[in-house]
Amino acid sequence: MKILLATTNEGKVRELRQLLKDLDIEILSLKDMDKKLEVEEDKETFLENAIKKATSYAKFYKLPVIAEDSGLEVDALNGLPGIYSARFFDIEFGKEVLKEIPENLSKDEKNNLKLLRLLENQTNRKARYKTALVFYNFDYGIWTEGVCEGQIAYKPEGNQGFGYDPIFIPEGYNKTMAQLTPEEKNKISHRGKAVSKLVEILKKVL
């Protein structure tokens, strides 16, 4: 059975392939598809965005789809970046801290730098990663969610993972997500928890 992962994010594809390895399926990503479809993530929650992506890509490619929307919620910023996590650097909120930005930074590095600058004088650094995962195959849909609690570090550390991993310290750890091995991360991450729930359900229905 072929299942399409509705993402072009190589980090997400890599993690999802590893987490789904126990299922007897062939995994494709959007980069494997000849025809291209852009689905705007314009909903107000991770779950709504994931549902929109799953149904839109399934109808377009005529394939079962696994879609995800995830992000980082920081208490001191009233839940931001939240659904804007992937494009946090570009939104209007917090633009005042974006002076003297080094050139040639990646998108992830820009997002991390903006967040660290906004929290510069903040002692409350509590945060959490959240994800909503949706499987849709025309006959039915399944959704699961995962949360990983933690806090924001004072500087980036580590070179594993992607996104906010270099500045996110999971609860119970004294190092960032980017300092964990992929196996360690998958055991505790928001994505790992959501996929584990989904795999258990899919084993019964596929």
UniProtKB/Swiss-Prot annotation:
Show the catalytic activity: XTP + H2O = XMP + diphosphate + H(+); dITP + H2O = dIMP + diphosphate + H(+); ITP + H2O = IMP + diphosphate + H(+)
Q: Which cofactor does it need?
A: Mg(2+)
Q: Where does Mg(2+) bind?
A: 40, 69
Cofactor binding description:
Binds 1 Mg(2+) ion per subunit.
Q: Which GO terms describe its cellular component?
A: cytosol
**Which Pfam families does the entry mention?**
Ham1p_like
Task: Write down the Gene3D superfamilies for this protein, in alphabetical order.
Answer: 3.90.950.10
Active-site feature positions: 69
Any idea which positions bind substrate? Answer: 7-12, 70, 162-165, 185, 190-191
Q: Which residues form a coiled coil?
A: none
Q: Which domain of life is it from?
A: Bacteria
| Biological process terms in GO annotation | nucleotide metabolic process; purine nucleoside triphosphate catabolic process
Which residues are listed as membrane-spanning? Answer: none
Keyword terms: Hydrolase, Magnesium, Metal-binding, Nucleotide metabolism, Nucleotide-binding
Reported EC number(s) for this entry are 3.6.1.66
Q: Name one GO molecular function term.
A: metal ion binding
- Cross-referenced InterPro entries, in alphabetical order? dITP/XTP_pyrophosphatase (IPR020922), ITPase-like_fam (IPR029001), RdgB/HAM1 (IPR002637)
Subunit comment for this entry?
A: Homodimer.
NCBIfam families xrefs: PRK14824.1 (NF011399), RdgB/HAM1 family non-canonical purine NTP pyrophosphatase (TIGR00042)
Function description: Pyrophosphatase that catalyzes the hydrolysis of nucleoside triphosphates to their monophosphate derivatives, with a high preference for the non-canonical purine nucleotides XTP (xanthosine triphosphate), dITP (deoxyinosine triphosphate) and ITP. Seems to function as a house-cleaning enzyme that removes non-canonical purine nucleotides from the nucleotide pool, thus preventing their incorporation into DNA/RNA and avoiding chromosomal lesions.
What does the similarity note say? Belongs to the HAM1 NTPase family.
The protein here is known as dITP/XTP pyrophosphatase
